[in-house]
């Protein structure tokens, strides 16, 4: 998916710059949101890795512990070309905890380990703390007010380009699958292609909403979330004024759909708007319905927390912030500057 065609919240950046001149410029630390239980048949292992992708480390951990690869899980994928502190979960019923002082893998260091009662699954994560270094910035005078605007007003909650695969290949394959040009039997590929389809449709609708300058306006029938919560409710006509006040106060968030086969969660004006957008992508919608993908909702805007920055010089800034799981750091960077390296990304 071409991220360049999506609407900006703070206008198109004028400055250019470089993200990830080296892996140390992109540091991600997982925030579990809980402490390990200290007992149980699972072992949580926190590993700092540089130059290794998530699945490669998971497979190595399985061999190290003498267990099947399926017995190692994690909360989400992390980019290879970055420094990441990530938790892995080893299922070791009736087995001793491995001696992680003997763990040796180039680019990796075990930081901590502890027993836990429950398996770590995809999404078992509160969020991620990021430290990014943006280099070769061409216009500090354009970037500085953008940083201030993002700290207070957030960014569009777009899925980053990594969701769509290298060169957007996951979306290309999803379209071919939708048109019956290929058969997709492998479970992981089916998941990737369906996820790319939903993400592309979310980005489309979110972008249209921003283009209409309605990102801060409650529409009749909107699906609204309590800030920081997953459930939503529909805005009724007689409640619009009160709901608008709550949105303005930061209590509520407008959502956009992750479409699927089922009720979209909106009504009235909001439903009509979303359906009109989805008419532009009939292939992807047909695929999601055919594969019985459950619909969901996602916040339209993303507010980085604990955001602060330090200019090292007029062309280099270090940026720190926290994002909830499932959000993309490059959706923040995209509002700051134009840059070529868009794959150093994921916060899932």
Curated annotation (Swiss-Prot):
Keywords: Isomerase, tRNA processing
Residues the entry annotates as binding substrate: 26, 128, 328
Gene3D superfamilies given in the database record: TruD, catalytic domain (3.30.2350.20), TruD, insertion domain (3.30.2340.10)
Gene Ontology MF term list: RNA binding; tRNA pseudouridine(13) synthase activity
GO BP: tRNA pseudouridine synthesis
Regions that span the bilayer: none
Catalytic reactions on record: uridine(13) in tRNA = pseudouridine(13) in tRNA
GO cellular component: cytosol
Domain of life of the organism encoding this protein: Bacteria
SUPFAM superfamilies xref list: Pseudouridine synthase (SSF55120)
Domain TRUD: 154-302
Record-linked InterPro entries: PsdUridine_synth_cat_dom_sf, PsdUridine_synth_TruD, PsdUridine_synth_TruD_CS, PsdUridine_synth_TruD_insert, TruD_catalytic, TruD_insert_sf, TruD_pseudoU_synthase
Enzyme class: isomerase
Summary of the function given for this chain in its UniProt record: Responsible for synthesis of pseudouridine from uracil-13 in transfer RNAs.
HAMAP family from the UniProt entry: TruD (MF_01082)
Family classification: Belongs to the pseudouridine synthase TruD family.
Name of the protein: tRNA pseudouridine synthase D
Species this protein is from: Serratia proteamaculans (strain 568)
Organism classification: Bacteria, Pseudomonadati, Pseudomonadota, Gammaproteobacteria, Enterobacterales
């Amino acid at each position: 998916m071409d991220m360049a065609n999506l609407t900006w919240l703070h206008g198109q950046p004028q400055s250019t710059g470089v993200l990830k001149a080296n892996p140390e410029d992109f540091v991600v630390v997982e925030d579990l949101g809980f402490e390990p239980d200290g007992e149980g048949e699972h072992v949580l292992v926190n590993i700092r890795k540089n130059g290794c992708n998530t699945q490669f480390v998971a497979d190595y951990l399985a061999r190290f512990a003498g267990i099947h690869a399926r017995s190692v899980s994690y909360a989400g994928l992390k980019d290879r070309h970055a420094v990441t502190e990530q938790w892995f979960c080893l299922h070791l019923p009736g087995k001793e905890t491995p001696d992680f002082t003997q763990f040796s893998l180039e680019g990796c260091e075990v930081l901590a380990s502890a027993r836990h009662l429950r398996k770590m699954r995809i999404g078992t994560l509160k969020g991620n703390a990021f430290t990014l270094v943006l280099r070769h910035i061409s216009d500090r005078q354009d970037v500085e007010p953008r940083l201030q605007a993002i700290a207070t007003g957030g960014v569009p909650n777009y899925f980053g380009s990594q969701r769509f695969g290298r060169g957007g290949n996951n979306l290309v394959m999803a379209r071919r699958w939708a048109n019956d040009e290929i058969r997709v039997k492998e479970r992981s590929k089916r998941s990737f292609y369906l996820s790319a389809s939903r993400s592309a449709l979310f980005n489309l609708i979110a972008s249209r909403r921003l283009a209409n300058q309605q990102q801060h306006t409650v529409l009749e029938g909107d699906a609204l979330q309590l800030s920081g919560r997953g459930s939503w409710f529909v805005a009724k006509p007689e409640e619009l004024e009160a709901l608008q006040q709550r949105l303005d106060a930061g209590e509520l968030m407008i959502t956009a759909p992750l479409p699927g086969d089922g009720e979209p969660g909106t009504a009235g004006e909001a439903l009509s708007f979303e359906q009109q957008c989805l008419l532009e992508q009939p292939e992807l919608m047909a695929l999601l319905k055919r594969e019985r993908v459950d619909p969901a909702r996602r916040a339209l805007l993303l507010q980085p927390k604990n955001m602060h920055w330090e200019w090292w010089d007029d062309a280099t800034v270090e940026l720190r912030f926290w994002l909830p799981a499932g959000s993309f750091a490059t959706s923040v960077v995209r509002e700051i500057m134009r840059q070529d390296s868009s794959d150093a990304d994921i916060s899932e």
